[in-house]
Curated annotation (Swiss-Prot):
Belongs to the RimP family. The gene is rimP. This is Ribosome maturation factor RimP. Required for maturation of 30S ribosomal subunits. CDD domains: YlxS_C (cd01734).
Amino acid sequence: MQTIEQQITNVIEESLTDMGFELVLVKFKGVNPKVVEILIDSLNGEKISVEDCTKASRTISAILDVEDLIEDAYSLEVASSGLERPLVKFENYNRFLGREVKIKLKELLNGKTRYQGKIIKAKNNKIYLKCEEQEVLIDYDLIKNANLVLTEEVFKKLLKQ
């Protein structure tokens, strides 16, 4: 059985894609009222604006009202996934080749559960990282969570835009 987050993903993802957005993450936070937090990114690499979040929010809200997946009262928050966005799909690793990433694993790999390094390659359900002077091969299924890292190099590129 699918979680409510997966059900929401299923009903909104295509519409967001049609609007030029990637659905990054759906999660619940808070209790009374619940908050449905939805993180989006641009498919073309552009920055996400407040207007983008507003447009996406209106579309998502209309879909959720029709689908009626959430029983209790809730509020909807749509936001940019940010500079240190989570990587939640295998395809994300190919999109961000060469970028620095922090990865937390579900279990030990070479005596560690945390790795930070540049994404060298993502192929056959494996992530190849350059960590300091060594290459680390991580099975995608071992990843608990991963986020991009805001490095000085990325920051300088942003300042030039």
